[in-house]
A protein has these predicted regions:
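Acyl-donor (CoA/ACP) binding surface of acyl/acetyltransferases
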Residues: 1-20, 24-30, 63-159
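Conserved GNAT-fold acetyl-CoA-binding loop/helix
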Residues: 30-52
Length: 159
């Protein structure tokens, strides 16, 4: 399902044909360094097939494939809270290193957030960022996020 089409990119649901490009672009240590440990590295075709299969099984679209020139080059994903936090969602994203610093991530993120608000009952979206990932902080600020707190010594990546 296509969600948004712009000059620079398309946002859509993940498709089986995206396995090769997902594997190619996500098998990057620089990206892995900024994601949660649940993301395997190295990233294999089997990892990609499992991710795409799980994304397609969900009843509500929560993983948006970023497509440039017909190639899947990134993801914007939402994870809903449970119980009393069910109207909250955490957003996470990555884009192929080849497309860093081109403005695609912030524009696509804004579109994905708008779509998610319009098609779910979520009323609050938040994000967490490693303190060293200044580029991701700028992306979030561009789309209107405000820093509401700092979790000191709350998570560790690579030791």
């Amino acid at each position: 399902m296509i969600v948004v089409t712009k000059d620079l990119y398309t946002l859509r649901s993940w498709e089986g044909q995206d396995t090769e490009s997902l594997t190619l672009h996500l098998n990057n240590k620089k990206i892995w360094d900024n994601c949660r440990d649940g993301l395997p590295h190295p990233y294999t075709k089997e990892n990609a097939r499992c991710f795409i299969s799980q994304a397609r099984e969900k009843t509500e679209i929560s993983d948006f494939c970023i497509v440039v020139h017909g190639e899947a080059i990134g993801n914007i994903g939402f994870v809903r809270g449970a119980d009393v936090e069910r109207f909250n969602a955490e957003v996470g994203y990555w884009i192929s290193e080849r497309y860093w610093n081109q403005g695609i991530t912030s524009e696509a993120l804004a579109d994905a957030i708008q779509y998610y608000f319009e098609h779910t009952e979520v009323i609050r979206i938040f994000a967490t960022v490693y303190e060293y990932n200044l580029a991701s902080m700028r992306v979030l600020e561009k789309v209107g996020f405000k820093k509401t707190g700092i979790f000191r010594k709350a998570c560790y990546k690579n030791g």
